[in-house]
Amino acid sequence: MKSKIMFFYTETPLHIGCGNDVGAVDSPVQRDSHTGFPIIPGSAVKGVLRDLQDDSSCNEVFGSASGEELSKSGDIAFCEGKLLAFPLRSMKNSFVWATCPYILGRFAERIGCEVPRFPALSDESKIYADSSVCVDGKHAVIEEYTFEVVPDTGILERVAEIFSKVECGGRVWRGSFGKRIAIFSDTMMSYFAKTACSVDQHVCIDDSTGIAKDGALFNIETVPSDSLFYSEMFELRAGAFDKLTFGGGMLQIGGDASTGLGFCKVDFFGKDCSDD
């Protein structure tokens, strides 16, 4: 079985909601249940690519549409998009792309790379990062927390090599990811992924009066711009990848497209990889 990896780099905030919630956020984003990391559901990936597919091969590649008398499964399996790097505010260097050993290990396994060990992260107040994010030579202020920076150039170079596979981030990503990557402990990464997403207030307007409806204030959670996800695709029947119409570029995924949310740059990783 052959597989490919799709990268999603969010050019605008992304909202793929999980429905109404009883918490403080009315419409939170979908998350991995055990890590709390935001995800892009496989159904969303499949749906947006199906919408871009040529009609002549749509059912063959993606399967029959619901309600059709003769049903057929698709020739490609689409997995959920997993978080790879998440932007966090930094007092120096504007922002960092946060990641952690769990994320790096999972991704490195899929692309056939080895991930280094991060012994300093047993102390959750430490991070691996470039010295350019330091405010006093050895500490960085990320969001509202101060971390001790471990400037291990060997580890950072190996992590940068893993991220060099990503091509969809454009000039911002390619020009600075080596200086902005920050490796946090798994615990701190999960905390930031849960708390550093934006929560935006909205109100429903009454068309007849032009003013807000009573009780119509609501909020939605969004994954910030400059986030990076990856998703695997598996070829269930030989030649299916060759029939895909979309070959990379800009697409919109998730809700609130008319207000500019969900625009992503998308790229496919290298050659087909054999699934072990």
Describe these PLM feature segments.
Residues M1-D276:
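Basic, Gly/Ser/Thr-rich N-terminal segments that form RNA-phosphate-binding interfaces in CRISPR RAMP
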